[in-house]
Structures are given as structure tokens and as C-alpha cells.
Amino acid sequence: MNEPIKEFTSSIPYWQPRVIPLELEQASDEQLDAMKVTVSNTKIGEYTLVLALDPETLQQRTPLFNGIMYGRGGLSRAETELGAVAASVVNRCIYCAAVHANRYSQLTKDESVMDSIFTDGEERDVAKEAISRLNNAVKSWA
């Protein structure tokens, strides 16, 4: 097993579940039905197979997540990713922070904001500016 990553990063780390994912061939009808709410049309990944161990939660979680991250109106996609980074930092979820930081940097074509947030925290000017934009965007929708 690889050593756990202990610092925030914009590079998406390898993810390995700590529980054994569901074997698709052994999935119940309820689990198969729950996996239909996922957005992938290519394959069902290990993450979804882990979530499918609790099909009721998966059926609720996926539409909620998709509504927050991809819904029409509200914050821009980059602002949504920045908000997801903030939530991931508060929750100390290094993997989720990396996924959302990477996507934010792709959307904005600017890695300096995430580098600044992860290196210097919210006190750095570039991080303060991004956080201020996010706060203003949230206030405009409140």
C-alpha cells in the first residue's frame, strides 16, 4: 500500500478504497438500480462500486452531487469547484480537494490560485481574491 498523502495538492492522487468494492456480477437488483443514477456511460468505477454497497445512499447522493456541481444557474462552474475545494479543505479530504482543485485550474487555466491556497492558505493575495470572488458570488444568489 502506498503511503497516505498528508498535504493538499492539485495533483490527483491514486485512490484505493479501504473496503472491498461491490463485484458488479454479484450486485442485487437494488444496487444495479442505484447505479443507474451515475453519469458514466463508459464503465462503472471502483468509487461507484464502493458507494453501491449502500444503494439507498447512492440513489440520494448522486443526484444531489450532480445538482450542486452541474446544475443550471447559480455559481459558475469554476466558482462551484472553488467552493468544493473549500469544503474539502474544511473536511480534510485531500483526495476530493485535489480533484476539485485540478478541475478549477483546468476551467480557469490558472494554477496559481490553488497553488497559493494549498501553500500559503487564505492569507495570500491571490487566494484572498479568489475567496472574495466566491463570497461575492454566493451573496449575489442569497
Predicted regions and their residues:
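Hydrophobic alpha-helical segments
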Residues: 1-142
